[in-house]
From Swiss-Prot:
SUPFAM superfamilies named in the record: Alkaline phosphatase-like
Post-translational modification: N-glycosylated.
Function recorded in the entry: Can hydrolyze NAD but cannot hydrolyze nucleotide di- and triphosphates. May play a role in neuronal cell communication. Lacks nucleotide pyrophosphatase and lysopholipase D activity in vitro.
Record: active site: 72
Residues reported in the UniProt entry to bind Zn(2+) 1: 36, 72, 238-239
Enzyme class: hydrolase
Protein name (Swiss-Prot/TrEMBL): Ectonucleotide pyrophosphatase/phosphodiesterase family member 5
EC number: 3.1.-.-
One example of a Gene Ontology biological process annotation: cell communication
Glycosylation sites: 101, 158, 292, 329, 362, 369, 382, 389
């Protein structure tokens, strides 16, 4: 007969081994949603019950400092790389690369040249290299072949595709036979309307309400698909918006001869490429031209913007004060709402909310950086982050789990010469790993207590038997 204590020992030992292992390998799901141009305080302009539902049952960060320039493509690429614009290479919506001798323009949609994107590696590729699957519904850059890869599933950009259809695809990919563990969902509003009418217009109210309804629809569909309680949903944006006025316009033609330069990017950060031999003339003419315009030589751009160490940043950069608009001449398009200004300005800051099994409940944090999102998502997915400019330590208090240990990274980087180095790389174990370790340790303690009690009882039983034997009289011969 197998001794009882041996059966108990083997059973408990198996449990100790299997429980943490199964928890450690549990695959987390992450869905990142971006509502383009959703300023941090839009949450309070009109009733937004679905946003507040997420806040009450999840986490909310009051102020998110994004990257300069505060435009769509630079900031969406920062969210998925953790890098400043000078490091990931997408420095504006409109760029010229003198090395490639090529232009990149969101306006003309010539954005599909892989070389513009390959100074960094976005999250979906890192996730797929780790053996997982990713899906993207219109997220900027996901329909570009980067490092010979696309997301596992993606929708080519088409603004006419409804939000509901985008959600349907995301749900389909998360519930497929071979499901994704990482999804990206993008919606163009409230940016489009914010440009047309300005963020201070009463016409923004219905747009914000509609986005709240769209978030409610997403939550409803996640619940219907039984994903709501086991998916980590992150709702964020790329930038805010500020109100402009035709009374606050800086017209470059008043100060510069248009034959002496090429205007690569426009308002509110004018990227100026002087014609050969005309640098000093252009700079001198513009340097003190307007009290609401600050003009920098490339090498004099403030370090805090992390913007000057890229070939795609032009020799002269002119930055308008908040609310001021740069036009080459009065015939150029003027927008009542704009962004791209100094990333220290609160009106440029986006939202950040999150809900899911990894996040705390009803928790509000004062501030974070958009570069921090990358390491947070890598942590949730338990994939190794590449060198980045963010900090997991800066956002780990959003999580309900124990904070992971950190070690310095050892990978080399391909950052431009003179660029700021990425912050300390943090090795992030997934939070189920720590739950598993805790439960495993608890079971091990219980096992040893049971084993010791069993051994004590066995010894006591043997001792009692011996005492009874001694008490019996010897047989008479």
């Amino acid at each position: 007969m197998i001794p009882e204590f041996l059966v108990v020992s083997c059973t408990l030992a198996a449990l100790c081994h299997s429980v943490p292992l199964s928890l450690q390998t549990e695959q987390q799901k992450v869905l990142v949603v971006s509502f383009d141009g959703f300023r941090w305080d839009y949450l309070y302009k009109v009733p937004t019950p679905h946003f507040h539902y997420v806040m009450k049952n999840g986490v909310h960060v009051k102020q998110v400092t994004n990257v300069f320039i505060t435009k769509t493509y630079p900031n969406h690429y920062t969210l998925v790389t953790g890098l400043f614009a000078e490091n990931h290479g997408i420095v504006a919506n409109d760029m010229f690369d003198p090395v490639l001798n090529k232009s990149f323009s969101l306006e003309h949609m010539n954005i599909y040249d892989s070389k513009f994107w390959e100074e960094a590696t976005p999250l979906w590729i890192t996730n797929q290299r780790a053996g997982h699957a990713s899906g993207a519904a219109m997220w900027p850059g996901t329909d570009v072949k980067i490092h010979e890869s696309y997301p596992t599933h993606y929708l080519p950009y088409n603004e006419s595709v409804s939000f509901e259809d985008r959600v349907a695809k995301i749900i389909e990919w998360f519930t497929a036979k071979d499901p994704i563990n990482l999804g990206f969902l993008y919606w163009e509003e409230p940016d489009d309307t914010g440009h047309d009418v300005g963020p201070d217009s009463p016409l923004m109210g219905p747009v914000i309400s509609d986005i709240d309804h769209k978030l409610g629809y997403l939550i409803k569909m996640l619940k219907k698909a039984k994903l709501w309680n086991n998916i980590n949903l992150i709702v964020t944006s790329d930038h805010g918006m500020t109100q402009c006025s035709k009374e606050r316009v800086i017209e470059l033609d008043q100060y510069l001869d248009k034959e002496h330069y090429t205007l690569i990017d426009h308002s509110p950060v004018a990227a100026i490429l002087p014609k050969e031999g005309k640098f000093n003339e252009v700079y001198d003419a513009l340097a003190n031209a307007h009290p609401n315009l600050t003009v920098y030589k490339k090498e004099e751009i403030p370090e805090r913007w992390h913007y000057k160490h890229s070939d795609r940043v032009q020799p002269i950069v002119a930055v308008a004060d908040e609310g001021w608009y740069i036009l080459q001449n009065k015939s150029d398009e003027f927008l009542l709402g704009n962004h791209g200004y100094d990333n220290a300005l609160a009106e440029m800051h986006p939202i950040f909310l999150a809900h899911g099994p990894a996040f705390r409940k009803n928790f509000t944090k004062e501030a974070m950086n958009s570069t921090d999102l990358y390491s947070l998502v890598c942590h949730l997915l338990n994939v190794t982050a590449l060198p980045h400019n963010g900090s997991f330590r800066n956002v780990q208090d959003l999580l309900s789990s124990a904070a992971p240990k950190a070690i310095p990274y050892t990978q080399s980087t391909t950052l431009p010469l003179g660029s700021a180095k990425p912050g300390e790389y943090e090795q992030e174990e997934s939070y189920p790993y720590y739950i598993g370790i805790s439960l495993g340790s608890l079971i091990a303690i219980v096992f040893f207590v049971v084993l010791i009690k069993h051994l004590i009882r066995s010894q006591m039983h043997t001792l009692q038997y011996m005492q009874v034997e001694v008490a019996q009289p010897l047989l008479q011969a």
